[in-house]
Amino acid sequence: MLVLGLETSCDETGVALYDSERGLLADALFSQIDLHRVYGGVVPELASRDHVKRMLPLIRQVLQEAGCVATEIDAIAYTAGPGLVGALLVGASCAQALAFAWDIPAIGVHHMEGHLLAPMLEEQPPEFPFVALLVSGGHTQLVRVDGIGQYELLGESLDDAAGEAFDKTAKLIGLNYPGGPEIARLAEQGTPGRFVFPRPMTDRPGLQFSFSGLKTFALNTWQQCRDAGDDNEQTRCDVSLAFQQAVVETLTIKCKRALKQTGLKRLVIAGGVSANKALRASLEDMLASIKGNVYYARPRFCTDNGAMIAYAGCQRLLAGQQQDLAISVQARWPMEQLPPV
């Protein structure tokens, strides 16, 4: 089955072709970072308009790269949520219109299920069951995964997601958008031990997260340095390092608890923050200490992309899932509501 995948949940337009027998044939991505940087964050209306502009050229590009023609496509998968409604509607409308014109099925895919399954595109994919850490700008969740659509929420953030905390903290200390990669870059030049930030909610049982207080702690630290005339580039690096260390250690502690609670030894990390090198290294060390394994997608498939949507949609279509011809998207969509396959 050859599936065209379309991703438009936020500020990246992703298109890919995935074949159930041959694997990923082609993928293309256009990032709107430069468009939104001047505003310090994503402007939903601008994001939607740019998706309209980019979608069809990217579809033509992946068809050309894969050496395929439109008549060979068996189905279309598109992101139906969660995300920005206007942006989601661009992908959904395009998918349903093409599916109607080509007389093929279209299926809406859960954005976070796409992230969760992205490591399946690698040469050594994880086997079920496993624990997944979904960590992005909008989500921080620990999920037990027994199969596609078989999800048990173990814990999640009570306020800011980890990626959101990265971006907000970066903005507070004067870094450019997107802030997460900027903090990671500066942290490499940071002085270990100059600042020590708290590890929120690690001193109590459970698998819930909270990062809003950590963001406030970073702001107060930066303001104290600024009041003392010490708001220079090295201080930014030191604050970035302390913040990143706190987030990484908090996530690692909670992942270790989740693995112990479930009795599993396989951990998948997915979502944009899973590209963070410090997080990967910390989780690899933790899994090695318990003789377990950690899995993640290659960096370009950690952030939003069409390949993960094409793969996730293909699996559900192969399992017989169908969808009526209707344009429906959801800004909020708990993953536990998805049917198992």
Curated annotation (Swiss-Prot):
Entry's localization field: Cytoplasm
Keyword annotations from UniProtKB, A to Z: Acyltransferase, Cytoplasm, Iron, Metal-binding, Transferase, tRNA processing
Keyword Metal-binding: yes
Positions with a binding annotation for Fe cation: 111, 115, 304
Keyword Transferase: yes
Main location: cytoplasm
Pfam families: TsaD
Record-linked CDD domains: ASKHA_NBD_TsaD_bac
Enzyme class: transferase
Identification of the protein by name: tRNA N6-adenosine threonylcarbamoyltransferase
Organism of this sequence: Pseudomonas entomophila (strain L48)
Recorded name of the encoding gene: tsaD
